[in-house]
């Protein structure tokens, strides 16, 4: 979907974010929003938003930011091919294992993925000199960073009924991961 709308030979994608429905269908694990941020060769920044509408992702097209803040030449594009099913399964399983080993007697069940954000921090125009001087900074600016949230319910808690609505308490746990799939709970 993203590759259909963003020509990666002309633009460098630096951030892609997926979010589930945060309304009536929350906890149903339905991907509803996709946001993509990218830069063109003239250092213009763009945001492209997709929303699930009637079973299809739609977009109004990219929005160009008025300010030039990031360097196209120095920024490393996000490797979309690295974000595949195997990688997602790997970090999801590691995150779930961290939660299960951390809880005290709670019977938590994974209900949904609330958000995934994949990012290679773009090099800001104000840091181009630092990028040119520092090999360490250059290496840091090429690393994919992942933030994600998983939603759990405690099976020992009963749902609450408020009129005709059923309210389920859930716990959101935030995680970070790297390109190698190492996962940590995000403080």
Where are these regions (language model features)?
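Charged interaction patches that mediate protein-protein contacts
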Residues: 1-2, 177
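Exposed beta-strand-loop-beta-strand "reactive/processing" segments of non-cytosolic proteins
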Residues: 4-49, 122-173
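Long, charged/polar, surface-exposed segments that mediate recognition or autoinhibition
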Residues: 60-118
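Compositionally biased, low-hydrophobicity segments enriched in charged and small polar residues
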Residues: 2, 26-35, 42-75, 85
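Generic detector of leucine side chains in alpha-helical contexts
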Residues: 1, 27, 31, 48, ...
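Broad, structure-driven detector of short, well-ordered beta-strand segments within folded domains
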Residues: 46-56, 111, 116-118, 171-177
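Sec/Tat-exported extracytoplasmic proteins
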Residues: 2-6, 38, 95-103
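A short, surface-exposed interaction/processing loop segment used at functional sites
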Residues: 54-80, 164-187
